[in-house]
């Protein structure tokens, strides 16, 4: 059986054209969160990520749905399970992964890690601003 986003948003006999693009974008966002979290889980389980890891698997819809209702200029804070919110606000997945791997190229130069990832440029203030250095220029 083939599952695709087009099959999920297009039902024969119903005109969903007004909502199809929104549904497609939402499903793509949820899928991006799930794939990112599964990759993080795998890396963490193999000992390639240090510290703690709080995944948001199962919470993809709430993160993407909440961020979909925001304007681009809105700011968010999140919880310790904030990867989905970060993705929902438009974060670059490569920089997010670099942050979780404690790399200098991460959003907080590798110092924020999983729980405190932040990106002022996209309006993501992180879960605990006091412990992160917001840096949107690097």
Name each model-derived stretch:
Residues 38-41, 48-133:
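Cofactor-binding active-site loop characterized by glycine-rich and histidine/acidic residues
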Residues 134-138:
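Positively charged, low-complexity/disordered segments
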Residues 1-62, 68:
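Conserved acidic/glycine
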């Amino acid at each position: 059986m083939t599952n695709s986003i087009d099959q999920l948003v297009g039902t024969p006999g119903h005109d969903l054209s007004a909502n199809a693009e929104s549904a497609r974008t939402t499903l793509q966002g949820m899928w991006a969160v799930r794939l990112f979290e599964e990759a993080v889980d795998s890396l963490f389980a193999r000992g390639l990520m240090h510290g703690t890891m709080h995944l948001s698997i199962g919470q993809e819809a709430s993160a993407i749905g909440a961020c979909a209702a925001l304007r681009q200029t809105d700011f968010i804070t999140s919880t310790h399970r904030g990867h989905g919110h970060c993705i929902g606000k438009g974060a670059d997945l490569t920089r997010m992964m670099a942050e979780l791997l404690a790399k200098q190229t991460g959003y907080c130069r590798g110092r924020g890690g999983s729980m405190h990832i932040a990106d002022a440029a996209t309006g993501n203030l992180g879960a605990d601003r006091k412990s992160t250095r917001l840096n949107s220029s690097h």
